[in-house]
């Protein structure tokens, strides 16, 4: 059985009198893709930022690869990958220059051009982030997050704002990263995204985890409670039609 790489115990976050995260607990195994699902305001991002050491923990503990995040935040940041927003990158540097900069900051040995090839951006090596499309920016931010060969890769709403083609292209990229054995923790409010990418999901609402299991087991439990779909289930969706008509090749 794979070892636990991330253990979250009774995690809480308060902003004044408002309790955004209310006693969240879960564990993630090495090589697992773990998804945190929930509507806006459920506490997903606050939970992720506390785990990453980017936000103070009000109560509870987070242990990542044997390190207590509250006590060793600097050490934790060296072994994780965090997907940055496009605005976080130096605007006047090219993609390959940015990756070299991040590599040197980490003291890593990664090859910037190989990282760009991994995310299908090698032809954009000399471009600046501002010249990229939305899908390309998201893929580059993942390349930057992989520069230190992280123990855990964190993706916060990685496909928000992308069209169906770019979203599915990013899913393909995450699946490629997953196939290499990288542990991934992601947040999303796209149910299909979680179903495609995640080994297990935790469903959050109002700061609490209200259910946690594999996508298949969660669906089986719902059916076991007598659930009847409100509409006929068909083998294709309108999104499938859109992608079929507009092209399945990589488009940004």
Regions found by a protein language model. Name each.
Residues 100, 104, 109-124:
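Conserved ABC ATPase "signature" region
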Residues 212-213:
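ABC ATPase "signature
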Residues 60-68, 75-76:
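Conserved ABC transporter NBD signature motif
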Residues 52:
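Helix-to-loop junction immediately C-terminal to a conserved catalytic motif
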Residues 153-156:
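Catalytic Walker B motif of ABC-type/P-loop ATPase nucleotide-binding domains
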Residues 128-132:
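Conserved ABC ATPase signature
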